[in-house]
Amino acid sequence: MNQDEYNSKFEVNDKESKLLKDAFNQVSDIRKFEIELYWKRAAYFWALIAVAFAGYFSILASEHMPSKFFLSLIVSCIGFVFTFAWFLSSRGSKYWQENWENHLDLLENNVTGPLYKTLLERPGHINMAEKLITGPLSVSVSKINQWVSVFIVFAWCLFNN
């Protein structure tokens, strides 16, 4: 669908359009829902991965466990699968969140004005400590999670050696 078709289907250029306002509200709610689901999924995977780590290290710490190395291999493979699933889930969640944010960008002008497109920042940092440590920083929390999951995937791979 091109921009003109989109604008026509959602009556983007009509400030009084009920369809436009309803679409904007629904898209806004879906975006919030996607973000909520992202964190629920992340917490779910964190719990599974933490259990896998605990199981892995408790197996290795056991002195008299038969098939100790085989069991640790099985648990580390399970941990790898959960971690890789977390990575893919994070990427998929980010995809859908950005989809709804793009809809908001297209719909918002005649509903709220360019609210989602407008970025307000502090005029400056007070000192170097605030700039480097305590001040705000434009980073993606979901990308941090993705990098952490990649690191943990490599950790599971190392545990298998």
Language-model segments: residues:
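Lipid-exposed faces of alpha-helical membrane segments in multi-pass integral membrane proteins
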Residues: 48, 52, 74-81, 148-158
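Inner-leaflet juxtamembrane helices
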Residues: 66-123
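A hydrophobic membrane-anchoring alpha-helix module
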Residues: 123-161
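Charge-rich, acidic-biased intrinsically disordered regions
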Residues: 46-68, 113-134
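Cytosol/matrix-facing amphipathic helices and coiled-coil assembly/linker segments
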Residues: 2-62, 86
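Membrane-interfacial loop-to-transmembrane-helix junctions in polytopic alpha-helical membrane proteins
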Residues: 35, 64-71, 134-144
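Structural signature of transmembrane alpha-helix termini at the membrane-water interface
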Residues: 55-62, 81-91, 158-161
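Short membrane-interface loop/juxtamembrane segments of multi-pass integral membrane proteins
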Residues: 20-27, 103-139
